[in-house]
From Swiss-Prot:
PROSITE patterns registered for this protein in UniProt: DIHYDROOROTASE_1, DIHYDROOROTASE_2
Record protein name field: Dihydroorotase
Cited Pfam families: Amidohydro_1
Catalyzed reaction equations: (S)-dihydroorotate + H2O = N-carbamoyl-L-aspartate + H(+)
Enzyme Commission no: 3.5.2.3
Single GO MF annotation: dihydroorotase activity
InterPro entries (UniProt xref): Amidohydro-rel, DHOase, DHOase/Allantoinase_Hydrolase, Dihydroorotase_CS, Metal-dep_hydrolase_composite, Metal_Hydrolase
NCBIfam families for the chain: PRK09357.1-2, pyrC_multi
Top-level enzyme category: hydrolase
Residues annotated as binding Zn(2+) 1: H61, H63, D153, D306
Residues that hold substrate according to the record: H63, L64, R65, N95, N279, H310, F324, G325
Organism: Lactiplantibacillus plantarum (strain ATCC BAA-793 / NCIMB 8826 / WCFS1) (Lactobacillus plantarum)
Active-site residues annotated for this sequence: D306
Amino acid sequence: MTTLIKNAQVWQAGQLQTTDILIAEGRIKAIGHQLHDQFGPADHVICADQHFVSPGFVDVHVHLRDPGQTAKETIATGTLAAAHGGFTTVGAMPNVDPVPDTPERVATMVARNQQEAHVHVAQYASITTGRTSEQLVDFAGIKAAGAFAVSNDGSGVQTAGTMFAAMQGAAKVGLPLAAHVEDDSLYHHGVMNAGPVADRLGLPGINNVSEAAQVARDVMLAEASGVHYHVCHVSTAESLRVIRNAKAAGINVTCEVSPHHLLLCDEDITMDNPMLKMNPPLRSAKDRAALVAGLLDGTIDMIATDHAPHTDAEKQGSMKTAAFGITGIETAFATLYTALVKTRLLTLGRLIELMSTRPAELFGLNTAGRLVVGAPADLTIIDLDHQYEIEAATMLSKGHNSPFIGWPVYGNVLMTLVDGKLAYGKETQA
């Protein structure tokens, strides 16, 4: 079957250009004009009406909550929400129950993802059994079973010896190691950023050093082990300084930033509001400015949402007792496009690179994040001019725990194709 996308706007040579895209057998067959003259009529035609067509977004940091926490999310609902947000590939974090910490459990998750997901799912395995700081997983076995990377996300590996051995094991088999960086001895059970805002609200704070100290430890271990070390959801200026220096020294370090850390800071927390509780927390305005600067100068390699759905009950009451985490996969593009591209801090092409091309390249997801002939037809069609208000009622995730509800934004995802097939669009809304 062939599909022709007509009158698409694509980002080429630093600007938007109009073209057609021909899809055959799930892959991009041709990009250009008057393709029907060369290839004949297509079986199906999608009129893009001059809307923007992007390579599908790639999010390497998503919590699908399945198995074990399906009241929050499932593979099906989380990946449909991903398609709604324009994502065609997501990395499923391993903080589920049971933890994918053996080859058998990883293989089970890979099979379930293939059967139940609406988009491509790259499966993480944990670094250690049970996501503790003790026994390492069988790195060769979990890679053979289909893991694309390892992470203990949600928990920092607390002992340097365990982390170094893990890095050596991951490096030996060529698996990236993605780290939730948090030193428990410096954490002190805080619920938001330590500082004047936390003091005013009477809430326990989380110091910047609890993150930055573990980043500093880990980059030295990464240099010694040769692993691809990836810092999850970087949030502090100090962490960025360490990462910037590590890159300058030639250490194989990459990092991601989440949309909420680019768009919000602790000064936006004017009351005890669980919808603004996440880990790492919203930091100071100075930290937020440093993250934006890191995005602009290339220190930050990619954007990842840390999509963390919860039930309504888990996000009620006080920040002292509510669960950490917010959703983000359905709001990421629109909020970032509105705040960064419409204000000319970033070009559209650079945002697409950060949300699609670079995460795919750096994590070895070589078939994702590209709008080129021969690549899988993982594409997102977006109305860049449509302004709308983010509403909980339109979200397809089970979790509606978003601080962006009510925000006016531009950039409405109209349709998402995965391997040339409709994953989200009008037909899925019937």
